[in-house]
Regions:
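Structural motif
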Residues: 160-165, 208, 328-329
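Extended hydrophobic packing segments that form well-structured cores
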Residues: 82, 89-90, 275-356, 361-370
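Short glycine/threonine-rich loop-to-helix capping motif typified by GTGT followed
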Residues: 172-184, 217-230, 303, 337-346
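A short, acidic, amphipathic alpha-helical segment used as a generic capping/interface helix at domain edges
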Residues: 138-154, 189-197, 263-282, 308-320
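Residues at the starts of beta-strands that form the adenosine-phosphate
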Residues: 65-66, 206, 287, 326
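Flexible loop/turn segments at secondary-structure boundaries
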Residues: 75-79, 169-173, 215-219, 296-299, ...
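Conserved, well-structured core segments that form the ligand-binding/active-site neighborhood
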Residues: 1-158, 165-168, 189-193, 197-201
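C-terminal catalytic subdomain
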Residues: 183-288
């Protein structure tokens, strides 16, 4: 969470300052190019996206007196009767196991709309674990340190097959539907990139996700997503082609502009950025399989395969990766980021970029706050 306090009175030289800022912004690569040039989204030193934003921020800091305030929250998505959902299954008590069985029984018999409504109303137990203030980049680094202590988990070796369950929520569907494009961005954009150094799955590996992939969109929040998914993806899935051929059309569409300004809709160009955000995952992975999909056309439009059960998906993945393929399950919640140690000539080696993670369990607020 980032916030900057701007000066109350802007000087007469503001126009010159603004021209410098906008000149810097205009030199930023298009998102599709910046993402392709990024080794990782979550490592600032390896991300062209971070470099672009930092460059703009430095220009602003040079000409304006910015006081930056930034905070970090804990990782507790569930509290109270649902707190057990944030545990590892091997840590479950008998009561937790009974609660999980009862929850699954209830959800299987509850209409989807009601399930979504109930879960969106369940409050998270978020709390402050760090607060820093001062100069922009120094403040941001303090908060990154707190996030690393909370999120990083050490893993030995990359997987041939990675399994991840897609949740009902993302940053872009609060009180709304997780539509197919958002399923894609969670799988190939967020979960795939939740790592430091190297991805959790090998180059050319298989990602198995579990989600019904229903062909449902919210016309109030995501109107341009509908056209993007059903009109553009049947033509091409190439991010650069989509950017060059269609992004400006969607950004300037009068209807989408009106809904963005006057309604509750995301910007008309927003679905493009959701597709770009999955670019690194699509380029790295050799196979993506969706388990339990309600249809065949949604995964096909995204270039995915489908399976009815997890066992079937694992068999399909082993057919590509080999019968001895290593399998890793990415467990959510809580949210984690992995530090993968690779086997080298002198044992295991860690790809360095930041200091190591603390021994604190993921999902527990770091005790040493910056």
């Amino acid at each position: 969470m980032r916030m900057s306090a701007w000066p109350r009175t802007l000087t007469k030289s503001w126009r010159w300052h603004a021209s410098r800022i906008f000149a810097c912004a205009s030199s930023v690569r298009p998102a599709a190019q910046a993402i392709r040039a990024s080794k990782s989204y979550m490592e600032p030193k390896h991300s062209e996206l971070h470099s672009s934003v930092d460059r703009i921020g430095r220009v602003i800091d040079q000409h304006l007196n910015v006081f930056h305030i930034e905070t970090a929250l804990n990782n507790r998505m569930f509290d109270g009767p649902l707190a057990f959902l944030g545990k590892r299954e091997e840590d479950f008590t008998d009561f937790d196991r009974a609660a999980l069985a009862g929850l699954r029984w209830t959800l299987q018999r509850t209409p989807r709309a009601l399930r979504q409504n109930v879960f969106h109303k369940v409050p998270a137990a978020y709390g402050l674990i760090a607060c820093a203030a001062g100069r922009t980049e120094l403040t941001h680094e303090k908060i990154l340190q707190a996030c690393r202590r909370q999120l990083f988990v050490k893993v030995r070796g990359q997987a041939d097959i990675l399994i991840a369950g897609i949740p009902y929520i993302s940053p872009y569907n609060v009180n709304s539907i997780l539509n197919p494009l958002l399923v894609q961005v969670m799988a190939c954009g967020y979960f795939f990139n939740m790592n430091r150094g190297v991805p959790l799955v090998k180059k050319g590996g298989t990602l198995i996700v579990t989600h019904p992939c229903m062909d449902e969109f919210d016309p109030v929040q995501h109107p341009s997503y509908i056209e993007f998914f059903h009109r553009l993806l049947p033509e091409t899935r190439d991010a650069m082609t989509l950017h060059m051929k269609y992004e400006r059309e969607f950004a300037q569409n009068p209807s989408y502009v009106h809904l963005y300004r006057k309604g509750n809709a995301y910007h008309g160009a927003h679905p493009f950025y959701m597709w770009y955000w999955g670019e690194n995952g699509r380029q790295h992975l050799g196979q993506i399989i969706a388990v339990g999909t309600e249809n065949t056309h949604v995964p096909e439009l995204m270039g995915w395969e489908r399976a009815d059960t997890l066992a079937e998906a694992i068999d399909m993945a082993r057919g590509r990766q080999g019968r001895s393929a290593g399998i890793t399950l990415m467990h959510h919640p809580p949210m984690v980021m992995t530090e993968v140690a690779l086997a080298g000539g002198d044992g295991l080696r860690q790809l360095p970029e930041h200091g190591g993670a603390s021994a604190a369990k993921p999902g527990i607020a770091a005790k040493e706050q910056p």
